[in-house]
C-alpha cells in the first residue's frame, strides 16, 4: 500500500498571525496526529459520514517517531508567539506604570509649587497687615498730638478771651469821650461778623464730624461684610472637606468592589482548576458565562461611578477656584476702600489744619486790635485827666471870679452831661457785647466737649476696627490654609481616580479577553465534541508510549482533553498581569 503524504495545512497553521485561530488549528492537528497512531480496527467503527481524508489518514501505516516529533516541534512557534505577546503586554503595562509614576511626580511638583506660592502670599499678606498696623498707630499718634495741640490752642484762646474781657471791663471805666464811640461801634460790628463766621465754622466742623462718623460706620459695615465673606469661605472649606471625605468613601467602596472582583476571578480560576478533569459540561460553561456577564456589569457600574465621581470632583474644584478668586477680589476691594478712606481722611486733616491756621491768624489780629484799643484807652484816660485838671482849675478860677465865668461854667457842665450820657450808652453796648461773648464762650465749651467725646469715640472705634482687622487677617490665613489642604486632597483624589480608571480599563480588557476565550472554547467544544467522543477510545499504545518523550505533549493533550484548563491558565495569567499593574 502506498503511504499518503501528510496534509500541508497541518504544518502551515502555526505560521498564522491571528491568536484566535490557534486553538482550532491545534485541535485539528491533534485529530490528524491521533489518526495514524490508532489501530486498524477503525475501518469497522468509522461512520459513513466521515470525510475521505480522515479515512485515507487512518488507512496509512504507522509513521515513524521522528516525524511525530517534527510535527510536535512545529507547535513551539505558537507558544513562542503567545509568550512574545504576553511579554509585549507586560512591556506595555510597565510603560503605563512609568507614565503614571511620571504623572505622580509632576503632580507632586505642582503641589510643592502651589505650597510655595501660598507661603509667599501669606508672607506678603502678613507684611501688608504689619504695615497697615504701623500706619494706623502712626496716624493715631499724629491725631493725638494734633488733638493736644488743639486743646492747648483752645486754652490759649480762652486765656486770651479772659484777658480781653478784663481789658473790656477796664475800658468801661476809662471810656469817656464821644469821639471814639463810632470807632467802637465799627469794631463791635466787626467782632459780631467774626462771631458769625466762627459760628459758621463751628457748624462746618460739626458737619465734618458727622461725615467722619458716616465714614466710620461705612468702614464697620464693610468689615462686617468681610467677616461674613470669611465665614462663607470657612463654610465652603468645610463643605469641600466633606466632599473630599465622601469621595474617599466612594473610592474605598470602589476598591472593595475591585477586591470583590479579584475574589471572583480567583474563584473562577479555582473552579476552572477543579473542573479541569471534566470534559464538556455545558452547565459549568453557562455558569462561567453568567459570572463573566456579572463581572462585566460590575465593571460598567464601576466605570460609571468613577465617571460620576470625576464629574463631581471637577465641579467642586471649579466652584472652589471661583470662590477663592471672589475672596481675593473682595480682599483687594476692601484694601482699595481702606486706601481711599485713608486718602480722604488725610485730605480732611489737611483742611482742618488750614482752618485752624486761619483761626489762629484771626485771633492774632484780634489781639493786635485789642492792644490798639488799650493804647487808645490810655490816651483817652490821659486826656480825661488833663480835662479834669482843667475843670479843677476852672472851678478854682470860678470861685475867684464867679461873675465873670458863669457862661464858661455852663458850657462845661453841658459838656460833662453829654460825656456822661455817652458813657452810659457805651456801658450798655459793652454789656450787650459781654453777654454775646459769654454765650459764644459757652457754645465754644460745649463744642469742645462734643469734639472731645467724638474724638474718644473715634479712637475707640479705631481700636475695635484694628482688632477686627487682625481677626479678619487671622481668619483669612486659616481659610487659605484650609484651601491649600483641600487642594492637596483634591490632587491626591485626582491621582487615585486616575489609578482606578486605569485599573477599571484593565479589568474590562481582562474580562473581554476571558469572555472571548470562553466563547471560543465553547464553540470548539460544541463542534468537535462528537468527534472527540467517537475517537477518544481508539488511542493506540504508541501514543501512550510517546506521551513522556516531548515536554509539550502534556500541555497539548490537556488542551485537547479539557479546554477549561486552558481558559483557567489564561485567567491566571491575566490575574498576574493585573496584580503587577496594581503594584
From Swiss-Prot:
The modification Phosphoserine is found at residue 540. Keywords: Chloroplast, Coiled coil, Phosphoprotein, Plastid, Transit peptide. Transmembrane segments: none annotated. Residues 102-115 have a biased composition (Basic and acidic residues). InterPro entries: ICR. It is found in: Plastid, Chloroplast. Residues 74-207, 238-516 form a coiled coil. It comes from the Eukaryota. Interacts with ARAC8, ARAC11 and KIN13A in vitro, but not with ICR1 or SEC3A. Belongs to the ICR family. This is Interactor of constitutive active ROPs 2, chloroplastic. It comes from Arabidopsis thaliana (Mouse-ear cress).
Amino acid at each position: 500500500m502506498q503511504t499518503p503524504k501528510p496534509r500541508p495545512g497541518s504544518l502551515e497553521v502555526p505560521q498564522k498571525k491571528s491568536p484566535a485561530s490557534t486553538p482550532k488549528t491545534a485541535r485539528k492537528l491533534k485529530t490528524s496526529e491521533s489518526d495514524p497512531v490508532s489501530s486498524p480496527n477503525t475501518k469497522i467503527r468509522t461512520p459513513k459520514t466521515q470525510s475521505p481524508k480522515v479515512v485515507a489518514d487512518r488507512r496509512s501505516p504507522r509513521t515513524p517517531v521522528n516525524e511525530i516529533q517534527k510535527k510536535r516541534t512545529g507547535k513551539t512557534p505558537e507558544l513562542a508567539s503567545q509568550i512574545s505577546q504576553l511579554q509585549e503586554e507586560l512591556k506595555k503595562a510597565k510603560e503605563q506604570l512609568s507614565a503614571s509614576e511620571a504623572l505622580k511626580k509632576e503632580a507632586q511638583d505642582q503641589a510643592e509649587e502651589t505650597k510655595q506660592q501660598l507661603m509667599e502670599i501669606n508672607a506678603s499678606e502678613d507684611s501688608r497687615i504689619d504695615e497697615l498696623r504701623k500706619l494706623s498707630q502712626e496716624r493715631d499718634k499724629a491725631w493725638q498730638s494734633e488733638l493736644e495741640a488743639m486743646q492747648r490752642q483752645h486754652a490759649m484762646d480762652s486765656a486770651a478771651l479772659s484777658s480781653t474781657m478784663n481789658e473790656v471791663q477796664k475800658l468801661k471805666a476809662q471810656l469817656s469821650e464821644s469821639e471814639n464811640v463810632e470807632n467802637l461801634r465799627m469794631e463791635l460790628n466787626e467782632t459780631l461778623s467774626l462771631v458769625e463766621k466762627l459760628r459758621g465754622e463751628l457748624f462746618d466742623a460739626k458737619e465734618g464730624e458727622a461725615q467722619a462718623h458716616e465714614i466710620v460706620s461705612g468702614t464697620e459695615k464693610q468689615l462686617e461684610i468681610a467677616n461674613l465673606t470669611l465665614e462663607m469661605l470657612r463654610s465652603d472649606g468645610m463643605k469641600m472637606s466633606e466632599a473630599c471625605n465622601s469621595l474617599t468613601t466612594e473610592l474605598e467602596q470602589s476598591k472593595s468592589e475591585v477586591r470583590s472582583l479579584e475574589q471572583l476571578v480567583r474563584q473562577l480560576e479555582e473552579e476552572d482548576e477543579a473542573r479541569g478533569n471534566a470534559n464538556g459540561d455545558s452547565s459549568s460553561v453557562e455558569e462561567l458565562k453568567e459570572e463573566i456577564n456579572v463581572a462585566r456589569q460590575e465593571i460598567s457600574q464601576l466605570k460609571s461611578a468613577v465617571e460620576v465621581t470625576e464629574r463631581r470632583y471637577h465641579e467642586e474644584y471649579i466652584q472652589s477656584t471661583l470662590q477663592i478668586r471672589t475672596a481675593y477680589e473682595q480682599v483687594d476691594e476692601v484694601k482699595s476702600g481702606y486706601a481711599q478712606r485713608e486718602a480722604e481722611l488725610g485730605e480732611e486733616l489737611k483742611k482742618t489744619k488750614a482752618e485752624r491756621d486761619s483761626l489762629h491768624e484771626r485771633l492774632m489780629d484780634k489781639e493786635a486790635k485789642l492792644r490798639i484799643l488799650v493804647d487808645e484807652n490810655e490816651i483817652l484816660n490821659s486826656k480825661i485827666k488833663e480835662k479834669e485838671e482843667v475843670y479843677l482849675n476852672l472851678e478854682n478860677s470860678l470861685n475867684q471870679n464867679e461873675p465873670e465865668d458863669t457862661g464858661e461854667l455852663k458850657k462845661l457842665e453841658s459838656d460833662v452831661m453829654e460825656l456822661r450820657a455817652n458813657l452810659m450808652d457805651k456801658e450798655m453796648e459793652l454789656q450787650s457785647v459781654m453777654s454775646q461773648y459769654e454765650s459764644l464762650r459757652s457754645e465754644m465749651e460745649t463744642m469742645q466737649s462734643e469734639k472731645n467725646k467724638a474724638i474718644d469715640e473715634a479712637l475707640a472705634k479705631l481700636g475695635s476696627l484694628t482688632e477686627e482687622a487682625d481677626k479678619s487677617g487671622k481668619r483669612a490665613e486659616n481659610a487659605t490654609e484650609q484651601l491649600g489642604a483641600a487642594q492637596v486632597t483634591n490632587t491626591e483624589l485626582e491621582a487615585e481616580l486616575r489609578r482606578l480608571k486605569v485599573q477599571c480599563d484593565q479589568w474590562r480588557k481582562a474580562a473581554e479577553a476571558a469572555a472571548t476565550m470562553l466563547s471560543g472554547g465553547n464553540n470548539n467544544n460544541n463542534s468537535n465534541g462528537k468527534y472527540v467522543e467517537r475517537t477518544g477510545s481508539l488511542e493506540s499504545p504508541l501514543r501512550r508510549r510517546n506521551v513522556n518523550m516531548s515536554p509539550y505533549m502534556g500541555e497539548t493533550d490537556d488542551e485537547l482533553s479539557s479546554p477549561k484548563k486552558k481558559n483557567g491558565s489564561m485567567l491566571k495569567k491575566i490575574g498576574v498581569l493585573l496584580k503587577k499593574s496594581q503594584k
